[in-house]
């Protein structure tokens, strides 16, 4: 959300959370959501008016939820970023809130795991993923939701995905790996796709599908990869403007 003033911030964010909840249930721009993955899910920061986004959105949706905070270091100034990433309102250096990743689900979440990712390029924003298991009928499915560093070169991003891939190899369950991979160049898209496909994952999203935008740029940042289950339908929920990302969605068939 690009907001310039703290005046009225709590009410504005409350309305945005409610708008997102409606979009995820009314079935117009995307099917009714059963599992929702959030990245940059703020928890009582000034920029979100003190709201806990994951908790409040889960309450409106009637979902179970799990959130892992990034653990942003206090008082550490952010490093200079690429110009196309510099529009984001930063979290205040002394803000007592935090951001993070979250999973929301209509089914109970089991075996919730925090996964810390190696991060070098952006010393003020630790990177992480969250994993959890849901039971669809008699079949368990493991879900990994990651927020990859946009500042890192391809090798740095793949090093983060390697940590997640190692975690996925520890389970024999069908697996979904998704999130904001910040593949903000065609080369990053290609190498990320090749990395996961080499490990048995598939995705229906064509390389270059716009999911993130500024006023002048549209890029493919967000992905859903699966192994052991099948994606039957998929899409990008445009023009749902509750974030600088358009939500991506997939209907997954579990045998």
Predicted regions and their residues:
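Extracellular/periplasmic catalytic domains that process cell-envelope and extracellular macromolecules
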Residues: 30, 59, 94-97, 123-125, ...
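Active-site-proximal beta-strand elements of phosphoester/diester hydrolases
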Residues: 1-10, 113-115, 140-149
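Short, solvent-exposed loop/turn segments at secondary-structure boundaries
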Residues: 46-50, 154-157, 237-238
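N-terminal, active-site-proximal structural segment of metallo-dependent hydrolase catalytic domains
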Residues: 1-83, 87-94, 98, 255
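Beta-strand-turn-beta hairpins that frame and shape the catalytic cleft
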Residues: 97, 101-113, 124-145, 252-255
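Active-site beta-strand/loop signature of hydrolases that rely on acidic residues for catalysis
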Residues: 20-48, 70, 104, 132, ...
């Amino acid at each position: 959300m690009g907001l310039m003033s703290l005046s009225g911030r709590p009410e504005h964010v409350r309305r945005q959370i409610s708008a997102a909840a409606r979009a995820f249930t009314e079935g117009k721009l995307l099917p009714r959501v059963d599992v929702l993955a959030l990245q940059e899910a703020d928890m009582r920061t000034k920029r979100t008016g003190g709201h806990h986004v994951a908790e409040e959105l889960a309450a409106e949706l009637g979902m179970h939820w799990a959130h892992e905070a990034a653990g942003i270091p206090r008082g550490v100034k952010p490093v200079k970023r690429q110009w196309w990433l510099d529009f984001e309102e930063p979290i205040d250096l002394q803000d007592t809130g935090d951001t993070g990743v979250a999973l929301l689900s209509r089914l109970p979440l089991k075996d919730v795991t925090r996964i810390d990712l190696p991060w070098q390029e952006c010393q003020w924003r630790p990177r992480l993923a969250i994993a959890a298991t849901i039971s669809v009928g008699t079949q368990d499915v493991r879900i990994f939701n990651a927020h990859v560093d946009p500042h890192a070169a391809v090798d740095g991003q793949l090093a983060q995905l390697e940590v997640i891939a190692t975690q996925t190899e520890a389970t024999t369950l069908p697996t979904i790996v998704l999130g904001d991979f910040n593949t903000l160049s065609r080369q990053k898209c290609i190498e990320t796709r090749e990395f996961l496909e080499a490990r048995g994952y598939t995705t229906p999203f064509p390389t270059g599908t716009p999911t993130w935008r500024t006023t002048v740029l549209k890029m493919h940042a967000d992905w859903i990869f699966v192994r052991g289950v099948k994606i039957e339908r998929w899409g990008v929920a445009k023009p749902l403007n509750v974030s600088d990302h358009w939500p991506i969605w997939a209907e997954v068939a579990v045998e």
